[in-house]
């Protein structure tokens, strides 16, 4: 075989391989989409009942503020530890 024939066979093999891969991927996408639609049709997600929204009260705001006050020293210590370990201070 001449180099031109070998090159032509290589191109032919490459294109047929790419065609098979694209065909397989398209079939795979179609199968996954079809299975998803079937599962959603026969096993729909239950509809959750929405609870009436509760307005934040003074107590919940105080608890959130208290959480921030408790976490502030922890955050400062973590930042200081990180800076020490990185040699930034």
UniProtKB/Swiss-Prot annotation:
Provide the coiled-coil residue spans.
none
Residue ranges spanning the membrane: these are: 13-33
Keyword Cell division appears in the UniProt entry: no
Which Gene Ontology cellular component annotation is one that this UniProt entry carries? plasma membrane
Annotated catalysed reactions:
oxaloacetate + 2 Na(+)(in) + H(+) = pyruvate + 2 Na(+)(out) + CO2
Name the top EC class: translocase
Which cofactor is recorded for it?
Answer: Na(+)
Its Gene Ontology molecular function terms? decarboxylation-driven active transmembrane transporter activity; oxaloacetate decarboxylase activity; sodium ion transmembrane transporter activity
State the EC number(s). Answer: 7.2.4.2
Tell me how this protein sits in the membrane.
Single-pass membrane protein
Q: Which GO terms describe its biological process?
A: sodium ion export across plasma membrane
Name where it mostly resides.
membrane
Tell me which UniProt keywords the record has, alphabetically.
Answer: Cell membrane, Ion transport, Membrane, Sodium, Sodium transport, Translocase, Transmembrane, Transmembrane helix, Transport
Query: Which subcellular locations apply to this protein?
Result: Cell membrane
Summarizing the function annotation, the protein's role is: Catalyzes the decarboxylation of oxaloacetate coupled to Na(+) translocation.
NCBIfam families recorded for this chain? oadG_fam, PRK02919.1
Please give the subunit comment from the record: Heterotrimer of an alpha, a beta and a gamma subunit.
Q: Of which family is this protein a member?
A: Belongs to the OadG family.
What name does the UniProt record give this protein?
Answer: Probable oxaloacetate decarboxylase gamma chain
Name the source organism: Actinobacillus succinogenes (strain ATCC 55618 / DSM 22257 / CCUG 43843 / 130Z)
């Amino acid at each position: 075989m001449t180099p031109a024939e070998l090159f032509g066979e290589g191109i032919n093999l490459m294109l047929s391989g790419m065609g098979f891969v694209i065909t397989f991927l398209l079939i795979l996408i179609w199968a996954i989409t079809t299975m998803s639609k079937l599962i959603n049709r026969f096993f729909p997600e239950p509809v959750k009942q929405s609870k009436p929204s509760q307005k934040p009260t003074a107590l919940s705001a105080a608890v959130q503020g208290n959480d921030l006050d408790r976490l502030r020293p922890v955050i400062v210590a973590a930042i200081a530890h990180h800076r020490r370990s990185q040699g930034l201070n």
